[in-house]
């Protein structure tokens, strides 16, 4: 059996019982205290939900704006023409176009965190379904990424709006900021994220909806959160 390093031993000492349930603020403070990476680690939340996303009436998906932002520079591409294209550029879009943007993406240039389109451009965007779909980038009117108000959508994407979607096992993951953020900023983002998930509870969900909540950092341990400390828990 391999020997534990000093850092690993210190981690075990600080964590103690790995079955412990933490208050949200306590978990945030501990993960910041335990950070060891040279880069600015992300704070990540995971929620186990009482849903089976194989059933259409139990799908959980939507958008939420994190009040403290994400700490990431999100690249945004917009399919639009004319005044809408100019508005998207003015709002900070990284790439705006029509057929030319289609060809660029078909060539493999897909380094974007969000793709937005005006409704009249969906005939073009639809040809990218097999490319954008698997990456979760296909514009969707339900998520506000197919909209005539592209400027507002670009500002939202750049201003801390993130998408959430439940996975097969009923789990939702989300990055809610960087460990360099203040404790208060991270708590505000946590509350906003969880609140959005609670509000997105599908009609087909049976029994207890919010079953487990965990917090972790990019290189740190996962901490279980006391549901009594969580809004909607």
Curated annotation (Swiss-Prot):
Keywords: Repressor, Ribonucleoprotein, Ribosomal protein, RNA-binding, rRNA-binding, Translation regulation, tRNA-binding. Signal peptide: none annotated. One of its GO terms (molecular function) is rRNA binding. GO terms for cellular component: cytosolic large ribosomal subunit. GO terms for biological process: regulation of translation; translation. The keyword rRNA-binding applies. It holds the Pfam family Ribosomal_L1. The keyword Repressor applies. Part of the 50S ribosomal subunit. Belongs to the universal ribosomal protein uL1 family. HAMAP family: Ribosomal_uL1_B (MF_01318_B). Binds directly to 23S rRNA. The L1 stalk is quite mobile in the ribosome, and is involved in E site tRNA release. This is Large ribosomal subunit protein uL1. It comes from Novosphingobium aromaticivorans (strain ATCC 700278 / DSM 12444 / CCUG 56034 / CIP 105152 / NBRC 16084 / F199).
């Amino acid at each position: 059996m391999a020997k534990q390093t000093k850092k690993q031993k210190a981690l075990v000492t600080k964590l103690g019982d790995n079955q412990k349930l933490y208050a949200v603020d306590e978990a945030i403070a501990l993960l910041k205290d335990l950070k060891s990476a040279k880069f600015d680690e992300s704070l990540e939340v995971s929620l186990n939900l009482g849903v089976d996303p194989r059933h259409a009436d139990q799908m959980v998906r939507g958008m939420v704006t994190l009040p403290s932002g994400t700490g990431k520079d999100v690249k945004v591409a917009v399919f639009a023409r004319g005044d809408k294209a100019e508005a998207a550029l003015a709002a900070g879009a990284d790439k705006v176009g029509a057929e030319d943007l289609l060809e660029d993406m078909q060539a493999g240039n897909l380094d974007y965190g969000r793709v937005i389109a005006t409704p009249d451009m969906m005939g073009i965007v639809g040809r990218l379904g097999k490319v954008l779909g698997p990456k979760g980038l296909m514009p969707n009117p339900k998520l506000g990424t197919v909209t005539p108000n592209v400027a507002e959508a670009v500002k939202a994407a750049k201003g801390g709006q993130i998408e959430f979607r439940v996975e097969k096992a009923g789990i939702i993951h989300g990055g809610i900021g960087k460990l360099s953020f203040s404790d208060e900023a991270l708590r505000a983002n946590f509350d906003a994220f969880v609140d959005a998930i609670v509000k997105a509870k599908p009609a087909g969900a049976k029994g207890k909806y919010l079953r487990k909540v965990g917090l972790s950092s990019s290189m740190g341990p996962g901490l279980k959160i006391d549901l009594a400390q969580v809004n909607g828990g």
